[in-house]
Amino acid sequence: MGFCIPLRSKMLKRVSRKSSSILARRPTPKKMNIVTDSENRLKKNSYIENTNQGNILMDSIFVSTMPVETLFGSYITDDNDDYELKDLLNVTYNIKPVIVPDIKLDSVLDRDGNFRPADCFLVKLKHSDGFTKGALYLGHSAGFTATICLKNEGVSGLYIPGTSVVRSNICQGDTIVSRSSRGVQFLPQIGGEAIFLIVSLCPTKKLVETGFVIPEISSNDNAKIAARILSEKRKDIIAHINTLIQYRQQLELAYYNSCMLTEFLHYCNSYADTIKESLLKETIQKDINIIHTNITTLLNETAKVIKLVKSLVDKEDTDIVNNFITKEIKNCGGVKNRDKIVNSLSLSNLDFRL
């Protein structure tokens, strides 16, 4: 099903665990193999460690992949924009509660039946949304939280506070189960939007009656620093991308004004016998010269920003960022007769790609 990242190796001994690097990129998920019900049951997670001291709540991170398009296709294609915007200091995201049949969540349930799915939420992140500080806390404090990536058209990052799990690019289908008391920090979103399904796993009546110990969660200061550095880097990339789009809008307006003034000057020259006001012509020409200077400056600044973004964006993410910039340029409001101006002045040929 995946692998488990142990966080308390002395207390919670497990066999053959994989470790996670501080900054990890996961390749495109491979096609999942079909397994029998019995095999699938054996591969399920176990969130309780049975020891001589009794049942102990595990402090581990469980990472796997899910066929989300098959299981949650309706949630991915849902166009209802009924999310609630949360826009606070250092935190911006959209969230709404959803009802998900338990059968669709079978792969994140434990094999011992100690936890059950309670509340489910969809979290949507648009370009520049995310957490620069803090985390999202949902669910029972003695339970677990499953974070499932349903859709990602941009570059999503995720950090489980206090652990070594800092992911710089979450792929569709990626699933991370962690202690609810840790929370989940979504790093600033770059480019297109992403949708995550958050599932709260609460202790069942059976586990509560049996009793269990809740150990103190561990902490990884190095990962915390790495997450903060990565978050700041992503904020810089977002700011530069926004600047590129802004420069493009300013260029269109400058080209448009230049075109209009040039036509007006041509009109004045064509009717020189009637329009003899030389001061007017001089003023128009000065304005045209100023605009051309501004255009040159904008083009130079654009080249600098593109070079800067290329140095910050991972090579694997270049196409994603390029597609987002192109889409935003096409969708942003432009000047009057925009298409005509852009085409006639070859503005569409300007290289805004990284």
UniProtKB/Swiss-Prot annotation:
The keyword Iron does not apply. Keywords: Late protein. Pfam families: Pox_F11. Induction: Expressed in the late phase of the viral replicative cycle. InterPro entries: Poxvirus_F11 (IPR007027). Belongs to the orthopoxvirus OPG055 family. Stimulates increases in peripheral microtubule dynamics and may increase the motility of the infected cells, contributing to cell-to-cell spread of the virus. Seems to inhibit the signaling via the GTPase RHOA and DIAPH1/mDia. This is Protein OPG055. The gene is OPG055.
